[in-house]
From Swiss-Prot:
Belongs to the SepCysS family. It catalyses: O-phospho-L-seryl-tRNA(Cys) + hydrogen sulfide + H(+) = L-cysteinyl-tRNA(Cys) + phosphate. The keyword Chloroplast does not apply. Transmembrane segments: none annotated. Pfam families: SepSecS. Keywords: Protein biosynthesis, Pyridoxal phosphate, Transferase. Its EC number is 2.5.1.73. Pyridoxal 5'-phosphate binds at residues 83-84, 187, 210-212. It is an enzyme of class 2 (transferase). It comes from Archaeoglobus fulgidus (strain ATCC 49558 / DSM 4304 / JCM 9628 / NBRC 100126 / VC-16). GO terms for biological process: translation. Converts O-phospho-L-seryl-tRNA(Cys) (Sep-tRNA(Cys)) to L-cysteinyl-tRNA(Cys) (Cys-tRNA(Cys)). This is O-phospho-L-seryl-tRNA:Cys-tRNA synthase 2.
Amino acid sequence: MLSKPMELLRPSKGMINVHPIQRGGILTEEARKVLLEWGDGYSMCDICLEGRVDLLDKPPVKRFKEEVAEFLGMDEVRFTAGARHAKFVAMSGFKGALVVDSLAHYTTYIAAELNGLRVYEVPNTGYPEFRIEAESYTDVFEKVKEETGDYPAVALLTHADYKYGNLADAKKVAEICRDYGIPLILNTAYTSGIMEVSGRETGCDFIVASGHKSWAATAPIGILATTFEFAERVFRVSEVRGNWSGRAFTKKEVALFGCSPVYGLPLVTLMASFPVVKERVKRWKEEVEKARWFVEEMEKIEGVMLLGERPKNHTLMNFETPSFNLIAKKHRRKGYFLYHELKERGIFGVQPGMTRNVKLNVYGLSWEEVERVAEAFKEIAEKYGLEVED
């Protein structure tokens, strides 16, 4: 018996999407135009002479790689299967202890575990701002030295975290790392591609980026940028040789699985969107202004309070919403009521079932759209008897 056809249309079509992990990855018109052209499997390998996607001349991936390195203020770039893969590759060049901020994404921990690194966390300031203080890296470095006899092999800082959208002081952390001689990995999954990020200006040794989170590309694709100092270590080529066949793969980079598995839409959409990405980072100040205005409007609703640093320096935000949670306890749809109320008003992306907290992102929305989202929350609040300031 044939299986029932799967419904593959997105429920968010035509709505304002405020999903916290999707705003920076919404495709540009230029990227949408290449979807059908390059949709076939292995489509970028039509004329592959070097056995590595990053060395292709047609399409010009090799040149693009150089342009991305310049854009990020670094020397060498590789494309990876997401930011999680980029972190794994960066960590593969080190042994010993890794110091990470306590707001790091779970994939940071998994990448460390896969590389056999022992993880030490930098505490945050806790409720309600959860900030990472740069000086705390010094304390943890000394703790590692005291416990192990050696300073950490490498450190990682999440530039903007996925929980609260706090923007960490990368330059200050990099200065501390440089004083200790500890290389720094800067995870910019939620920053580079939507705001200006430069490795030379911050002083970091590695930049990890996410094409599908912040560079308007299809998933999965990440970027790892580094300096000449570390390129050979983390992009080391294969030395294996078959004992019977004598086969060797001397151009294949080990941590990249030989050839980065992004040969198709992820890479070509990244390339197509790049001219727009280079320009849009210059408008970051206005994006932050929208976010700050939105916070003011949301906090006019009874019981709603922003979590994370103030003022906002990023467009991803997390609100504590106990008043909506009280409504959910009495509503027949329980925690799903808010999701459905927003959907009826053309707003999509808030996690279904969640009313204790509301996490969203307004990056790339027009002022009119940001206002519509704020008004939708206010309307829902008033509908259920919550007070809303004028």
